[in-house]
């Protein structure tokens, strides 16, 4: 089985999931007009995301010869984002603080991972549970973020910048706890880079992400003000 990035299996996965995602979002946009209908769509997606991230974490718990329940807690930015985003969609209110922290991180992280799933060859087939659940929770997270934006559930504004600061701090706190208490060699790339041979640890990625996110917020704010000016 060709498990290379952009190999046969990866291309087949993209050829199936991307069109289905687009079609699903288009249909949701067309038919989910009421707030109740939008809520049903979003909570269904949130439930699906929660299922896949829990399956992924359980596959890590039982992956080796001994049961390791400490693995139930995600130790990556994407994994934790999938978990907290799913919970926020299921139990949070519109435009909640978690959305403001996770929408951009989820959008960027899920897109990069779906297009470059470096874990694809970790098992004998793509159906190896840690692999397929990893692919699917990233794919569903991407759909969830797009659906939240599409349905106007997030009012993106620079005034909520602090959500990203506190969210990122919380992630690193969890990571430090996992390393100190459970003996993880690394968590949230505190100690090791996301790409081997690069300096891209969390401490390097954080300012890069902050600058990129700040530029996105600035662009959105300028576009919003221009539209308001044109209306007046």
Each predicted region: which residue ranges?
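N-terminal topogenic module of multi-pass integral membrane proteins
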Residues: 1-42, 47, 53-55
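Membrane-proximal helix-loop-helix units in multi-pass membrane proteins
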Residues: 87-151
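Juxtamembrane "helix-exit" motif on the non-cytosolic side of transmembrane helices
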Residues: 55-65, 115-125, 181
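Hydrophobic/aromatic-rich structural module bridging two neighboring secondary-structure elements via a short loop
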Residues: 64-98
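Hydrophobic cores of alpha-helical transmembrane segments in multi-pass inner/ER membrane proteins
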Residues: 13-25, 78-90, 137-151, 204-220
